Amino acid sequence: KDFLKINCQLDELEKTLNNFIYKNQLNKTVFKDLSSLKNLSRLNSKITFSTNFGRDIEYYSGVVFEIYSSSNKEIARGGRYDGLLKNLGSDKNISAVGAAINLNNLKI
């Protein structure tokens, strides 16, 4: 329940997750995939990390994301879809990342 309350800026993510891990006596390797997100903090953008996505995300298998403009309009959303094709009947288990871009909210 507390995990779904995590909401922080990307540069605070490591500290926030470490506090959560310590408080809940978890193994740190649970969040090893999230460490690669630290590289995104080099971008000159405000990036917020939240564990409460608020959508039906059963077909996602890993990190799920949403990208918003400075005026709070959704620009894109997506995530990892490992195993989705196999669940849909494929003989192969294919790893994938996908996103949908909302072209109406892009400024050109």
Where are these predicted regions, by residue range?
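Positively charged, Gly/Ser-enriched RNA/tRNA-binding surfaces
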Residues: 1-108
